[in-house]
């Protein structure tokens, strides 16, 4: 049993002496797979969060993205299209038999996505290990992200199999109900799980799920994340794929979990739910606000670059930093 676990709202980072005149001097960029991105943030590879248009926008503006895998037949054309535009391609695959064929097809046509994410709910499995090896055999130049996992053993095993990065988080997301349906996961202690996994990792980690505020991005970086995957904070933008509905004069967009019945069109093996999030305006505004908030975080950390955050002290505030005020 692990003692003393904690989550985002239980932690406060402690400021160090500021060395910049303005937060604008702080650099939030991060490197992953040989490319530099503006932010250590990636929108969740979910159907209500990302589509081709958003992927294109993110790539054009030096942000990281991972395209979802819920329209598998469009992926080949998507990779080709991104490459024709001079942009990088980043896609997701599962572990079923047809995915092996798809990887082979990419290799046969010499269509090599720069990033391939193997994305299943319980990533510590032979199925994922076999798929990592398959991709590394046929697409050796692709950067492989594998997940999702929640233990140091899983991180070590996937790295050993050839994964270039691992994705950590089992069911902590806002529309993920794995924790409720199964009793398993990192819900409620995602930040401690991230720290535990990061200590075992020799390659980058993507923290996935449980982010509710921009400050949580800085906390993720402090505890070892190279990238932070975010769903609900990216849901509900003008550009977001979901349907817009009006209720009591307010605009909302739908947001659902990747294993929800809305996603699957069926009621079996449901581990996701649907919710409506308030319409948030443009994606560019949110990305800018995230950048500015993270620049402030870096200035509080006493540095000029993102890495400064990794060295700050922290306290565990067991009464929750919101003191009963719900801000989300």
Swiss-Prot record:
Q: Which UniProt keywords apply?
A: NADP, Oxidoreductase
Q: Where does NADP(+) bind?
A: 205-228
- Please name the Pfam families in this protein's record: IMPDH
Which GO annotations describe the biological process of this protein? purine nucleotide metabolic process
Entry's Gene Ontology cellular component terms: cytosol; GMP reductase complex
What molecular function terms (GO) are annotated for this protein? GMP reductase activity
Q: Identify which residues the record assigns to the active site.
A: 176
Checking CDD domains in the record gives: IMPDH
> Catalyzes what?
IMP + NH4(+) + NADP(+) = GMP + NADPH + 2 H(+)
Gene3D superfamilies linked:
Aldolase class I (3.20.20.70)
- What Enzyme Commission number(s) does the record list for this chain? 1.7.1.7
Q: What does this protein do?
A: Catalyzes the irreversible NADPH-dependent deamination of GMP to IMP. It functions in the conversion of nucleobase, nucleoside and nucleotide derivatives of G to A nucleotides, and in maintaining the intracellular balance of A and G nucleotides.
| UniProt record similarity statement | Belongs to the IMPDH/GMPR family. GuaC type 2 subfamily.
Q: What is this protein called?
A: GMP reductase
Organism annotation: Shouchella clausii (strain KSM-K16)
Please name the gene that encodes this protein.
Answer: guaC
């Amino acid at each position: 049993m692990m003692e003393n676990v904690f989550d985002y709202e239980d932690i406060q980072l402690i400021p160090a002496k500021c060395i910049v005149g303005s937060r604008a001097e702080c650099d939030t960029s991060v490197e992953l797979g040989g490319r530099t991105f503006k932010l250590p943030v990636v929108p969740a590879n979910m159907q209500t969060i990302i589509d081709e248009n958003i992927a294109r926008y993110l790539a054009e503006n030096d942000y990281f993205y991972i395209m979802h895998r819920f329209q598998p037949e469009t992926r080949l054309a998507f990779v080709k299209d991104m490459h024709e535009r001079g942009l990088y391609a980043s896609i997701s695959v599962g572990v079923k038999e047809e995915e092996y064929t798809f990887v082979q097809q990419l290799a046969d046509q010499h269509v090599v996505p720069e990033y391939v994410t193997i994305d299943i709910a319980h990533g510590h499995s032979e199925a994922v290990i076999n798929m990592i090896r398959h991709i590394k055999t046929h697409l050796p130049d692709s950067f492989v992200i594998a997940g999702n996992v929640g233990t140091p053993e899983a991180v070590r095993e996937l790295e050993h199999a050839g994964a270039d990065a691992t994705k950590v988080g089992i069911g902590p997301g806002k529309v993920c109900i794995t924790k409720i349906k199964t009793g398993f996961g990192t819900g409620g202690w995602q930040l401690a799980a991230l720290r535990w996994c990061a200590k075992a990792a020799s390659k980058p980690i993507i923290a996935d799920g449980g982010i509710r505020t921009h400050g949580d991005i800085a906390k993720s970086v402090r505890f070892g994340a190279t990238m932070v995957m975010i769903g609900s904070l990216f849901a509900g933008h003008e550009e977001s794929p979901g349907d817009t509905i009006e209720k009591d004069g307010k605009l909302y967009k739908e947001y659902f979990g990747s294993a929800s019945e809305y996603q699957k069109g069926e009621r079996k093996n449901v581990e996701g739910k649907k919710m409506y999030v308030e319409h948030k305006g443009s994606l560019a505004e949110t990305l800018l606000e995230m950048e500015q908030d993270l620049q402030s975080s870096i200035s509080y950390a006493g540095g000029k670059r993102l890495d400064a955050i990794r060295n700050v002290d922290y306290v565990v505030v067991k009464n929750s930093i919101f003191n009963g005020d719900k801000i989300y």
